[in-house]
């Protein structure tokens, strides 16, 4: 604990300094023989915890000094004086002093008062530390609860796994689907109350703009939209062929049972299976691909898988 003593009587300053040191109350870090030498910024710089100040001093008295420093000094103040006028004592307390000690100096009284002030400071420090810890905990909780602005790497991992399960890894449209997944995740975070999914046009437009940059012309964006849609369509057809092959070989295949009916209309899968079983290489009819359904299910399954992966890691 660091003390500063302001009193025009050298003997009083010496006695107070001796008591502080003998009783291990702290350190007498500075002295002044007049209130005009006491400034709030100086006390703060010296890290003074307790200011001991006389009321009556020739230049600037204790009352006026407290008024001058009360906005810049955050430590505790104990006033020492031979003045007994209730009005002046009351004014000192109204300015925020902790105690008023009457002269002549009584060692026991000084030690008792300074111990109480010291304990109050230590208690305030403890409470402040607890409040700081709680504040950090609350902030950490809020940060965890706050949605991430960037695409979650865990969702990307889930999407990559799904592409492998769907037989689409290595296909040109796989990268486009991952870009769509990222856009849908960020769109859901920014528009949490929007019930309807974005249209395919909106999805492909935003994905194209992100890829080309905002400086791209509308012609370039339209060209990229069409190319991206075609790549994804070819990748979906490849996945359809993949599941039809699995179903033809083993109708109870776990992957076939898990994904085929989720991502495709089953009549389309059944038609593709018949084509594979037919000796005629010519398709019975063009496969009808529901791209919006596929993309929507891909997003939902990736989110579900991501949540499952997180739970397993906890």
UniProtKB/Swiss-Prot annotation:
User: Looking at the keywords, is Iron-sulfur present?
Assistant: no
Posttranslational mods: Phosphorylated by GlnK.
The biological processes this protein is annotated with in GO are:
phosphorelay signal transduction system
Q: Which GO terms describe its cellular component?
A: cytoplasm
Positions of post-translational 4-aspartylphosphate modification: 54
Q: Where is the Response regulatory domain?
A: 2-118
| Single GO molecular function | DNA binding
The UniProt keywords, alphabetically, are: Cytoplasm, DNA-binding, Phosphoprotein, Transcription, Transcription regulation, Two-component regulatory system
Main localization is cytoplasm
Q: Read off the Gene3D superfamilies from this record.
A: 3.40.50.2300
* Record-linked Pfam families: Response_reg, YcbB
Transcription regulation keyword on record: yes
SUPFAM superfamilies per the record?
CheY-like
Q: Where in the cell is it found?
A: Cytoplasm
As a miscellaneous remark, the entry gives:
Disruption of glnL by Tn917 insertion leads to protonophore-resistance.
What does this protein's UniProt record list under function?
Answer: Member of the two-component regulatory system GlnL/GlnK that positively regulates the expression of the glsA-glnT operon in response to glutamine. GlnL binds the promoter region of glsA-glnT in vitro.
Q: Note the PANTHER family from the entry.
A: TRANSCRIPTIONAL REGULATORY PROTEIN GLNL, TWO-COMPONENT RESPONSE REGULATOR
What protein is this chain from? Transcriptional regulatory protein GlnL
**What is the organism of origin for this protein?**
Bacillus subtilis (strain 168)
């Amino acid at each position: 604990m660091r003390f500063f003593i302001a009193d025009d009587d050298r003997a009083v300053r010496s006695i107070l300094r001796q008591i502080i040191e003998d009783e291990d109350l702290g350190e007498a870090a500075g002295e002044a023989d007049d209130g005009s030498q006491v400034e709030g910024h100086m006390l703060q710089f010296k890290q003074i915890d307790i200011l001991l100040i006389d009321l009556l001093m020739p230049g600037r008295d204790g009352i006026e000094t407290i008024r001058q420093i009360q906005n810049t000094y955050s430590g505790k103040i104990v006033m020492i004086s031979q003045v007994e006028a209730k009005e002046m004592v009351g004014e000192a307390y109204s300015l925020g002093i902790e105690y008023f000690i009457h002269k002549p100096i009584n060692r026991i009284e000084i030690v008792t008062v300074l111990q109480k002030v010291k304990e109050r400071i230590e208690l305030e420090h403890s409470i402040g530390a607890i409040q700081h810890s709680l504040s950090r905990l609350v902030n950490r909780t809020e940060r965890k609860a706050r949605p991430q602005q960037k695409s979650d790497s865990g969702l990307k991992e889930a999407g990559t796994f799904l592409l492998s399960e769907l037989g689409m890894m290595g296909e040109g449209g796989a990268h486009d689907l991952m870009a769509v997944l990222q856009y849908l995740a960020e769109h859901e975070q920014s528009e949490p109350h929007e019930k309807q999914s974005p249209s395919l046009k909106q999805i492909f437009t935003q994905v194209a703009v992100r890829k080309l940059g905002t400086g791209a012309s509308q012609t370039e964006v339209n060209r990229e939209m069409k190319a991206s849609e075609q790549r994804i369509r070819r990748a979906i057809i490849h996945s359809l062929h993949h599941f039809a092959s699995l179903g033809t070989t083993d109708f109870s295949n776990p992957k076939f049972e898990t994904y085929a009916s989720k991502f495709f209309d089953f009549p389309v899968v059944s038609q593709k299976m018949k084509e594979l079983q037919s000796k005629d290489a010519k398709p019975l009819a063009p496969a009808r691909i529901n791209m919006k359904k596929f993309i929507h299910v891909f997003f939902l399954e990736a989110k579900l898988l991501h949540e499952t992966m997180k739970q397993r890691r906890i």
